[in-house]
Structure formats: C-alpha cells, structure tokens
C-alpha cells in the first residue's frame, strides 16, 4: 500500500489547534501523541516552537508521533535558531551562534523572538538542552515518494554543502 502524507506546518506552540487538526484528519489519541490513520503519516514542516501558549505540549505530541512512526518532522528556522541560541560561537567568545548574551540590538531582538519558548522550557535547563538536542536530530529536508519536503526553500548548493559535511541524512 502506498503511504499518503498529511503535511502540517508552523504550529508555533498551539497545542489545542494541533490536537483539533489531528482529530479532524482522523488521527486517534495514543499515549502522549496521536496514531495516524491506516495508510497515512503526518509530516511536520518545523516551526513547532515560539509564540504559542503550549510549546512543550506541541513538542511532546510531535516527538511521540515521530517516535511511534505516525509522523516525520523536519527542522524549521525556529528550531534552528534554538540550537544556535544555546551553541557557543568559538569565533565570538562569550556569545552564541544566535547572539543573545550581549546588550546589543541584535541580541535583544533574538531574545525577544525566543522569550516564550525560554519561559516554557526554563532557559538553560536540562529540558531546554534536551529539546535542542532533539532538534539537532531533525533533518532539514525529506525525500518522500519522489517529492522533497523542506521548510523554507531548496538550494542545491546548500544541500550539497550539508551532505559534504557528513550530514547525509539532513540532520545537524
């Protein structure tokens, strides 16, 4: 049987809307996630976090679905930024790749964009680091049945650079 895909993008921490959507598409509650209908699989296009009131619940639902095989998930720019927010930049000691520690306009903007997620996971906590670690496992694209699934756009040169760096599965 050929698998059909339900493509879902930009949830941004809105768990109630996600749960409603999954139910309307025939997904059944299963543990902390949902089970796909026969012959279907959810494909989340990233941007699971930032903005919404229940970001950790969204992450729990999506991760449970990925772990059970009911879904696949790719990295969105908000998850990419969350990784950079925690990763020290050796070229700029005392700062992260996503600047947030200095009192500069860019660092203040980056903190503001990420403030809701940080409040919900506890900035710098084990929970925060754990989710960032999981984000690193997410591919930046998927090839599904002859189709490519990406969050924002496709660039052959960028994809080739990722593959040359050893990220052949698309994960960071």
Predicted regions and their residues:
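Active-site neighborhood of divalent metal-dependent phosphoester bond hydrolases
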Residues: 52-59, 64-172
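N-terminal active-site segment of His-dependent metallophosphoesterases
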Residues: 1-61
């Amino acid at each position: 049987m050929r698998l059909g895909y339900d493509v879902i993008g930009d949830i941004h921490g809105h768990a109630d809307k996600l749960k409603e959507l999954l139910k309307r598409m025939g997904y059944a509650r299963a543990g902390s996630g949902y089970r796909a209908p026969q012959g279907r699989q959810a494909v989340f296009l990233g941007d699971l976090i930032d903005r919404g009131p229940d970001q950790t619940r969204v992450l729990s639902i999506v991760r449970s679905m990925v772990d059970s095989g009911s879904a696949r998930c790719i990295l969105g720019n908000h998850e990419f930024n969350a990784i950079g927010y925690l990763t020290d930049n050796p070229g700029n000691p005392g700062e992260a790749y996503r600047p947030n520690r200095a009192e500069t306009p860019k660092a203040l903007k980056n903190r503001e964009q990420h403030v809701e997620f940080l409040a919900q996971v506890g900035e710098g906590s084990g929970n925060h680091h754990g989710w960032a670690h999981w984000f690193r496992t997410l591919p930046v694209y998927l090839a599904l049945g002859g189709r490519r699934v990406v969050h924002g756009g496709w660039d052959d040169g960028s994809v080739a650079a990722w593959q040359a760096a050893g990220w052949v599965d698309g994960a960071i």
